[in-house]
Swiss-Prot record:
It is found in: Cell inner membrane. This is Prepilin leader peptidase/N-methyltransferase. It comes from Klebsiella pneumoniae. Signal peptide: none annotated. It catalyses: Typically cleaves a -Gly-|-Phe- bond to release an N-terminal, basic peptide of 5-8 residues from type IV prepilin, and then N-methylates the new N-terminal amino group, the methyl donor being S-adenosyl-L-methionine.
Length: 228
């Protein structure tokens, strides 16, 4: 198994089209699962009865009828159904194919920017969780602890061996990320009596600090500010 993984960089270099195709198809499959997380995790947070990430099987959000496996094929199912549910004829949200395409594109981009191995694995995890968090935030204005905290710990875990930054920088980055937004939150609240940020924002910046280190926090805040 380890020997096969060690051969991946050579395979990617010799067969870039096959490598890119593998990454794209993998991204489509993972993107399909990410849609499940985006739809169900907020329901689970509301303690909806009988719903978790695995049960029940995929169902129509409008009429809650089970979705046949052939209609659940990433991207193709949406195209075959022409964007409408087979069971009730209601429009299928374009978020589903867009999430699958976005995940596929990000997997390919990461695969060509990073050599196969631990850095690529970490990069895919980081990009995937950020994509899910962005979709949930846009839908519900929530950043669930069930995603932000594992993202932070994963960043520290990958940086135990300085995969992206030295561990000390990652730890300081996590602390600085949290405390910087926490300070802004309380200063703004004391001055205006209003809340401009949520605790999920603090934890997300802490997670990014754990992955990228404290030195990347100013650039991260600058890039994130237009979406705030």
């Amino acid at each position: 198994m380890v020997e096969n993984i060690a051969l991946l960089p050579e395979f990617a270099a010799q067969y870039p089209f096959l490598w890119g195709s593998f990454l794209f198809l993998s991204g489509l499959a993972f993107g399909s699962f990410f849609n499940v997380v985006i739809h169900r995790l907020p329901l689970m947070m509301e303690q909806a009865e009988g719903i978790n990430l695995c049960f029940p099987a995929s169902f129509c959000p409008q009429c809650r009828e089970p979705i046949a496996w052939r209609d659940n094929i990433p991207l193709l199912g949406f195209l075959f159904l022409k964007g409408r549910s087979r069971c009730c004829g209601q429009p299928i949200s374009p978020r589903y194919p867009l999430m699958e395409l976005a995940t596929g594109a990000l997997f390919v981009l990461a695969g060509y920017l990073m050599a196969p191995g631990v850095p690529l694995l970490g990069g895919l995890i980081l990009l995937s969780l950020l994509l899910i968090l962005a979709a949930i935030d846009a839908q519900t204005q929530l950043l669930p602890d069930g995603l932000t905290l594992p993202l932070m710990w994963a960043g520290l875990l990958f940086n135990l061996s300085a995969t992206y930054v030295p561990l000390a920088e990652a730890v300081v980055g996590a602390m600085a990320g949290y405390l910087s937004l926490w300070s802004v939150y309380w200063v703004f609240r004391l001055l205006s009596g209003k809340e401009a940020l949520g605790y999920g924002d603090f934890k997300l910046l802490a997670a990014l600090g754990a992955w990228l280190g404290w030195q990347a926090l100013p650039q991260t805040l600058l890039l994130a500010s237009p979406a705030a």
